[in-house]
Amino acid sequence: MLVRGLPLRSVLVKGCQPLLSAPREGPGHPRVPTGEGAGMSSHSPRPFKEIPSPGDNGWINLYHFWREKGPKKLHYHHFQNFQKYGPIYREKLGNVESVYIVDPEDVALLFKFEGPHPERFLIPPWTAYHQYFQKPVGVLFKSSDAWKKDRLALNPEVMALESIKNFIPLLDPVSQDFVSLLHRRMEQQGSGKFSGPIIEDLFRFAFESITNVIFGERQGMLDEIVDPEAQRFIDAVYKMFHTSVPMLSLPPDLFRLFRTKTWRDHVAAWDTVFSKAEQYTEKFYQDLKQKRHFDSYPGIFYRLLASNKLPFKDIQANVTEMLAGGVDTTSMSLQWHLYEIARNLRVQEMLREEVLAARRQAQGDTSTMVQMVPLLKASIKETLRLHPIAVTLQRYPQNDLVIRDYMIPAKTLVQVSIYTMGQDPTFFSNPRRFDPTRWLDKNKDLTHFRNLGFGWGVRQCLGRRIAELEMTLFLIHILENFRVEIQHLNDVDSTFGLILIPEKPISFTFWPITRAPPQA
């Protein structure tokens, strides 16, 4: 029974016992020796069916899952299963069977054997929509050589470290405009500060950022009057995520067959995403054909066209996926980050001091400045530890694999519970504490295969560099201009809406630095 009055997250973490009973090594972030945990054993491994499990009937399991917590608490379901079964277990929900692991050493082994063309779990309703309506797909849905071809063409423009310098002039003005937006909100409230939720503004900020990086042109989403068609796209992405959850364990074709509201809303959301993305790409394609010379970086879309490595339809499909994936994910991460620094004012001041010092030393050069804020970058990792966007990472091993002395057959879905990993004292000392400095420890064993917020390896998040830079610049400008407080210090619980989102709106108070109230 849960303690009355405490949110579920608090009860779970406060009562959390280390998942592994073997003695640990190292201060703060102990690790399992490979031979003891993840390694191959000298004797025959135990069969797959002996992996701890609630039972093999997926429909009975699904019934209990829906009855007890349901999909909105999927991350807590994983957490409690690890508490019950240990560091590895298998579960079949509906027609989806997975093996779940959590120890970083086991994760390292999984990724070591992921193969040259890693495969991950495809979200069933997304796949169903694309197949039923014969929509073009990008790297999110492709596999094998088709995936590799697209990814090799995209990486130099999206993932290469040197590409960051091209993104800064496009992303930095958007962050500056967000500061201006908050000042306008203060003037409207007339109290010398702004108090209220900002998630809708963060959605628009993220959309403005990703479209500017891709197309090299602003959409005006931080103005007082915004384009209603662009707002439709933002709303559609949110609905597309939200309506996916009920169809994760039940076949989407069942929802389609009975024309449920969930399926109809999901289709309408995807239709809007594709329609608007097609309009954007066609418009900018025609504009670019008229213009051959650019005085500055023209955006990812033009660079992909100019490279001539992919046909237009593949560029269009990948741009659509980047647009759809670049709104809710980044905005939610920023909201969680503001939530944590508003609750931890000492950390906020440490971050502010680092940012102000970096600004002075860089003498106004933003490219130099973003290289001089290691604590700020560590704070982003820390936010993603406590509030990961995805609750698991998934892989289908190419060959048979032995983890914890259990044989896992090739092509079995293996899920890494990064939410549980981030909450467990076995892997992070004082896991409930927001402590960015833990990521700055020079002992690499302390962070070994723990920083998984953007995935890992060749199939990590395609938009990682954009998102990291976007969040870094945003937080730099917020910390330079405002002291951020939260109106209620009680824990805000999270809910699973395909990504982890706050269970209730978070209201912040932004004080201009010159008017910030004295610290206690």
Curated annotation (Swiss-Prot):
EC main group: oxidoreductase
Entry cofactors: heme
Chief localization: mitochondrion
Molecular function in Gene Ontology: cholesterol monooxygenase (side-chain-cleaving) activity; heme binding; iron ion binding
Keywords associated with the record: Cholesterol metabolism, Heme, Iron, Lipid metabolism, Membrane, Metal-binding, Mitochondrion, Mitochondrion inner membrane, Monooxygenase, Oxidoreductase, Steroid metabolism, Steroidogenesis, Sterol metabolism, Transit peptide
Binding site for heme: 461
UniProt cross-references to InterPro entries, sorted A to Z: CYP11_CYP27_families, Cyt_P450, Cyt_P450_CS, Cyt_P450_E_grp-I, Cyt_P450_sf
One of the protein's GO biological processes: cholesterol metabolic process
GO cellular component, one term: mitochondrial inner membrane
E.C. numbers: 1.14.15.6
Reactions catalysed, as given in the entry: 6 reduced [adrenodoxin] + cholesterol + 3 O2 + 6 H(+) = 4-methylpentanal + pregnenolone + 6 oxidized [adrenodoxin] + 4 H2O; 2 reduced [adrenodoxin] + cholesterol + O2 + 2 H(+) = (22R)-hydroxycholesterol + 2 oxidized [adrenodoxin] + H2O; (22R)-hydroxycholesterol + 2 reduced [adrenodoxin] + O2 + 2 H(+) = (20R,22R)-20,22-dihydroxycholesterol + 2 oxidized [adrenodoxin] + H2O; (20R,22R)-20,22-dihydroxycholesterol + 2 reduced [adrenodoxin] + O2 + 2 H(+) = 4-methylpentanal + pregnenolone + 2 oxidized [adrenodoxin] + 2 H2O
Places the protein is found: Mitochondrion inner membrane
Span of the transit peptide along the chain: 1-39
Pathway terms, separated by semicolons: Lipid metabolism; C21-steroid hormone metabolism; Steroid metabolism; cholesterol metabolism
Region (Disordered): 19-47
Subunit structure: Interacts with FDX1/adrenodoxin.
PANTHER family in UniProt: CHOLESTEROL SIDE-CHAIN CLEAVAGE ENZYME, MITOCHONDRIAL, CYTOCHROME P450
Function description: A cytochrome P450 monooxygenase that catalyzes the side-chain hydroxylation and cleavage of cholesterol to pregnenolone, the precursor of most steroid hormones. Catalyzes three sequential oxidation reactions of cholesterol, namely the hydroxylation at C22 followed with the hydroxylation at C20 to yield 20R,22R-hydroxycholesterol that is further cleaved between C20 and C22 to yield the C21-steroid pregnenolone and 4-methylpentanal. Mechanistically, uses molecular oxygen inserting one oxygen atom into a substrate and reducing the second into a water molecule.
Similarity field: Belongs to the cytochrome P450 family.
Protein name: Cholesterol side-chain cleavage enzyme, mitochondrial
Species whose genome carries this gene: Equus caballus (Horse)
